[in-house]
Amino acid sequence: MTSTKEIKNKIVSVTNTKKITKAMEMVAVSKMRKTEERMRSGRPYSDIIRKVIDHVTQGNLEYKHSYLEERKTNRIGMIIISTDRGLCGGLNTNLFKQVLFKIQNFAKVNIPCDLILFGLKSLSVFKLCGSNILAKATNLGENPKLEELINSVGIILQEYQCKRIDKIFIAYNKFHNKMSQYPTITQLLPFSKKNDQDASNNNWDYLYEPESKLILDTLFNRYIESQVYQSILENIASEHAARMIAMKTATDNSGNRIKELQLVYNKVRQANITQELNEIVSGASAVSID
């Protein structure tokens, strides 16, 4: 039978673990709120750039930008955004499953995939898979700078412009709320126009100087950069939300485990006391008989 001392040591150990997970939960809540604020403030920027591009391209039907050109798919590129750290439940695992499924589907029709990786977790997984990694960036922190991302994004854009890559996708975890984060894979290039009522509306609030087609190059690059940056913010917010949930679950489980150990401790202690009483009674009986 386990001794009361061993059970006490287990209770102390689980209690210490509970304190750690509770602290990590509170830190994750604080970081999630800050990142969520930055993430939500950045969404309108990406949406408006897309609307401007839709409007400009609609007004210049004779001008065909390379980012709008649909061509036969011989090779694809994928930007994968993961976390640098663990302890966030199945956040990375669920994303990697979808990414690998998509890559395998392209591989079945002999279409290879080149990768741009953000985050240590994606690097460790796809390095083991033997994937062709064009560039990587890790340890971006809580508030990544756009300058840190431009080089990696520029590499895959250069590959696309040189027609060595025909489609570019981006994979990340989209933040819905603190309880829901969804693995998402969207196509970045070629750019697909939206049949947006605002874009087709003649009443438009913008004038373009210089001519609209001269600014499309800049607009497209800014759009791609903003989409990647926004996706990274979405993934960071998802990471903190997932970690908050994981740590809350761990804290609750620790509490339940402490209760179970306390019950076992009481039973063992009671059994020991009962045994000692029986020994005392037996000893007293033996003395009285003598």
Swiss-Prot record:
This is ATP synthase gamma chain. GO terms for cellular component: plasma membrane; proton-transporting ATP synthase complex. Gene3D superfamilies: 3.40.1380.10, ATP synthase, gamma subunit, helix hairpin domain (1.10.287.80). GO terms for molecular function: ATP binding; proton-transporting ATP synthase activity, rotational mechanism. Coiled coil: none annotated. The gene is atpG. Keywords: ATP synthesis, Cell inner membrane, Cell membrane, CF(1), Hydrogen ion transport, Ion transport, Membrane, Transport. F-type ATPases have 2 components, CF(1) - the catalytic core - and CF(0) - the membrane proton channel. CF(1) has five subunits: alpha(3), beta(3), gamma(1), delta(1), epsilon(1). CF(0) has three main subunits: a, b and c. It holds the Pfam family ATP-synt.
